[in-house]
């Protein structure tokens, strides 16, 4: 035992000595890495040995990394006294500030960077440095807070001035714009030819083959010395008659101011040589003799001429003379213009269809067509108008030659004397009164006249045009509202004030099945019943009568009823059986109430109906009163309102015999 303890103590001392002899390279407390693997061996002597791989604390491993040196310590269980010492030593180690474990490797321990960075203060410092770096980076993007508002304004002004320096000068821009405008004006002026004074002359090459013929320059004078009309007859052409028409009698010195004019050659002149003599056509002659259109000068023109030539008084006098001259020339032109062509003369022509008047132009299509062709071009020349009018008058004066056809046989034309639609009887009478058919002279065949150009007939009168005021058909007569409409039978109002035969039969069936019931229980007195003679139950003698006698008796009874109706009608006492009645011909109010309640009408309505038909005032109704009451119930069910009084036509509809006779048709 002593030998074992001595060996263990020697090993422990050697380990502590080795730890104490090595210098401390780091200020931080070291940790001892203890391997979790423990080899527990039981000696044959009964002692437990704990062998573990341990590394020296803060020891520098100088061996190569492939085979690190790991001293093995064998733990030997000692007695209780030794174990107490070991526990105390472990407590001292645990209470010491150095930790038991260390995360750094021996290589990391040798490097100063790892040792310095592993400190908490260094870590906190590095975090602060990173935060400060980020804060300065974000502040660099913003404007400096040290700048004053005045400094900022100066910087903005400098930036604006720097930008304006790059913009080109406004004067240069204006010069450039003026240059472009002047170029446009020059191009316009080069294309326009004007004369404004005596000194301004136009020099043009007359020998060039230009489509425009200009007036000679020696004849261009001041435009305000005299008045000259503008002889333009269209918006594209201007033809001075003094140059184009050498035969005109217009004096050049008396025409007034002259303006340069442009003559546009027609396609005909461009195709043919004008210098070569040729025969002018009518169209060319008419185009050359076109009358001028006068254009008077304005007051501004006269004012300009006054400023250049003379005083203001001379200008005013000159202006008044010009106005007078212009008005005079206008009046002369109006007189020179040809008048409208008169209508052709109407000549009577005979035809089978009736007498009417027609002009010669309609019968001679060639002449009318030629006149239209010649008159299609409007001209102001007086000679042309007179010649044309004279030619038309000569055409009208000449006799018209109609084509001749062989005469037709009378046998083939005898059917043509019949009266036609729209022909008066006088024309037919004249043809028949002349004698035989051979005496009647038929007119020569003429050229048919179209319906569009034919004049209206003389005997036909213009009818007055009457416009429709509505789209409805006025020919249809207005139907009576009370008349029966087959298409709408539900809108028939003809039987509203009378009881129809079908309804009467239906009501009589209800009456026959309920009359005279429950009178055995009646205690009150009923009007018209003779209680002294046995309650009016008289036995009637049944007598066989012939049908003729029965019909005569019924007709006599009806006449008596009508006479009584004339005196009082349905309001009489006999009609309501007030003076004379039979129990079998009455119906009690309790029965009537049960029948009428089946209609499900309100009790107030049924009470009003009872008051309208109750003439007996004893709680009973006779046959006419019951039938009228049933009809009023049906009318209320149909939706009609009750009247204050039952119409007389309803009571009169019940006075008939009630016999319907059917007539058989003939075989």
From Swiss-Prot:
It comes from the Eukaryota. Residues 110-121, 298-312, 358-371 have a biased composition (Low complexity). The keyword Lyase does not apply. GO terms for biological process: lipid metabolic process. Residues 81-91, 133-144, 276-289, 325-335 have a biased composition (Basic and acidic residues). Residues 1-10, 18-33, 46-61, 92-109, 234-248, 376-394, 424-437 have a biased composition (Polar residues). Residues 1-123, 133-152, 234-441, 459-488 are annotated as: Disordered. Keywords: Lipid metabolism. Residues 568-661 form the EH domain. Belongs to the IRS4 family. Positive regulator of phosphatidylinositol 4,5-bisphosphate turnover and negatively regulates signaling through the cell integrity pathway. Involved in rDNA silencing. This is Increased rDNA silencing protein 4. It comes from Meyerozyma guilliermondii (strain ATCC 6260 / CBS 566 / DSM 6381 / JCM 1539 / NBRC 10279 / NRRL Y-324).
């Amino acid at each position: 035992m002593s030998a074992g303890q001595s060996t263990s103590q020697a090993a422990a001392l050697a380990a502590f000595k080795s730890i104490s002899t090595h210098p401390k390279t780091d200020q931080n407390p070291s940790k001892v890495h203890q391997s979790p693997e423990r080899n527990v061996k039981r000696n044959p002597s009964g002692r437990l040995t704990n062998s573990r791989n341990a590394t020296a604390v803060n020891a520098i491993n100088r061996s190569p990394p492939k085979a690190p040196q790991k001293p093995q310590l064998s733990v030997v269980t000692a007695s209780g006294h030794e174990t107490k010492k070991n526990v105390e030593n472990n407590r001292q180690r645990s209470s010491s500030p150095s930790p038991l474990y260390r995360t750094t490797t021996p290589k990391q321990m040798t490097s100063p960077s790892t040792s310095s960075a592993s400190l908490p203060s260094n870590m906190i410092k590095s975090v602060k440095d990173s935060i400060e770096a980020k804060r300065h980076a974000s502040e660099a993007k913003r404007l400096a807070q040290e700048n004053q508002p005045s400094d900022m304004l100066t910087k903005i002004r400098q930036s604006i001035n720097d930008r304006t320096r790059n913009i080109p000068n406004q004067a240069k821009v204006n010069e450039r714009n003026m240059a472009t405008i002047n170029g446009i004006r020059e191009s316009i002026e080069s294309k326009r030819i004007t004369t404004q004074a005596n000194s301004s002359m136009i020099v043009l090459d007359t020998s060039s083959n230009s489509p425009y013929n200009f007036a000679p320059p020696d004849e261009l004078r001041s435009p305000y010395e005299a008045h000259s009309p503008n002889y333009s007859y269209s918006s594209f052409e201007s033809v001075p008659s003094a140059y184009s028409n050498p035969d005109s009698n217009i004096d050049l010195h008396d025409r007034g101011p002259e303006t340069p004019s442009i003559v546009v050659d027609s396609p005909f002149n461009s195709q043919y040589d004008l210098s070569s003599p040729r025969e002018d056509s009518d169209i060319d002659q008419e185009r050359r003799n076109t009358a001028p259109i006068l254009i008077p000068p304005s007051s501004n023109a006269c004012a300009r001429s006054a400023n250049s030539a003379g005083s203001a008084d001379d200008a005013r006098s000159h202006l008044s003379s010009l106005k007078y001259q212009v008005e005079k020339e206008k009046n002369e032109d109006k007189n020179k213009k040809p008048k409208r062509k008169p209508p052709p003369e109407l000549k009577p022509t005979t035809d089978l269809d009736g007498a009417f008047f027609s002009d010669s132009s309609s019968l001679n299509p060639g002449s009318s067509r030629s006149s239209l062709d010649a008159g299609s071009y409007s001209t102001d020349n007086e000679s042309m108008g007179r010649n044309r009018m004279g030619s038309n008058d000569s055409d009208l004066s000449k006799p018209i030659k109609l084509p001749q056809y062989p005469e037709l046989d009378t046998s083939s034309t005898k059917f043509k004397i019949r009266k036609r639609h729209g022909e008066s009887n006088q024309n037919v009478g004249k043809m028949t009164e002349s004698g035989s058919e051979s005496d009647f002279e038929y007119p020569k065949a003429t050229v048919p006249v179209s319906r569009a150009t034919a004049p209206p007939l003389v005997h036909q009168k213009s009818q007055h045009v009457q416009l429709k005021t509505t789209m409805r058909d006025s020919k249809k007569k207005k139907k009576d509202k009370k008349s029966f409409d087959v298409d709408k039978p539900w809108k028939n109002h003809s039987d509203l004030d009378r009881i129809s035969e079908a309804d009467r039969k239906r009501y009589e069936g209800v009456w026959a099945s309920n009359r005279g019931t429950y009178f055995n229980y009646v205690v009150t007195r009923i009007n018209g019943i003779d209680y002294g003679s046995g309650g009016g139950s008289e036995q009637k003698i049944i007598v066989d009568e012939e049908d003729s006698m029965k019909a005569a008796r019924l007709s006599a009874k009806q006449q008596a009823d009508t006479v009584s109706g004339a005196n009082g009608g349905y309001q009489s006492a006999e009609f309501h059986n007030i003076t004379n009645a039979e129990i079998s011909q009455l119906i009690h109010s309790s029965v009537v109430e049960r029948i009428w309640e089946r209609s499900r009408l309100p009790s107030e309505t049924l009470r009003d109906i009872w008051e309208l038909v109750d003439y007996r005032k004893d709680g009973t109704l006779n046959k006419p009163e019951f039938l009228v009451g049933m009809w009023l119930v049906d009318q209320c069910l149909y939706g009609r309102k009750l009247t204050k009084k039952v119409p007389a036509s309803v009571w009169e509809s019940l006075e008939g015999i009630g016999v319907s006779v059917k007539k058989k048709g003939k075989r």
